[in-house]
Amino acid sequence: LIAANHLQDKVLLKGKIKPSELNEVTVTAYAGITLFENNGLSNYLSLANRFFDYIQAGIPQLCVDYPAYRQLNERYNIALLIPDTTTASIVNGLNYLLSDAVLYTQLKENCKQAAADLNWQQEEKILIDFYQQLLG
């Protein structure tokens, strides 16, 4: 796909990366890609950790338009959503994301607010409140 679209100078596949090294690689990316085939409810309804990694790094991303991604994107506008994982959709989405500087800058800026809201420090408060209510 990379060679067929002459993107060797723009796309670098790093292979397997140790979790401890992932953040230092992620912050160097221009755009993130969070794509899963719709081959079951698990993929269709879940949110990938990398989705949040890109947000925390302030990196706009390309995501397939599944409900959880759409819901967060409607709130924060941090990703370009594509209808499916066909080659044409991925190529068109990436080209659009990479060529529209205004969109890219807006998504990048929006990641800041999303990062402030979507993190463990905020989720911890919600979880503690939940348990306090549960315990009465």
Give the positions of each predicted feature.
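Nucleotide-activated donor-binding/catalytic signature segment of Leloir-type glycosyltransferases, i.e.
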Residues: 1-23, 31
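Conserved acidic donor-binding segment of nucleotide-sugar-dependent glycosyltransferases
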Residues: 75, 79-87, 96-101
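Short alpha-helical segment that forms part of, or immediately flanks, the ligand-binding pocket
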Residues: 20-23, 45-57, 67-71
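Hydrophobic "lid"/C-terminal helical patch
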Residues: 2, 94, 127, 131
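Acidic donor-binding loop of glycosyltransferase active sites
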Residues: 26-44, 59
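A charged, aromatic-enriched C-terminal amphipathic alpha-helix characteristic of glycosyltransferases
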Residues: 24, 89, 102-133
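Conserved donor-binding/catalytic loop of nucleotide-activated donor transferases
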Residues: 27-30, 51-60, 64, 76, ...
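Short loop/turn segments at beta->alpha junctions
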Residues: 17-18, 47, 65, 86, ...
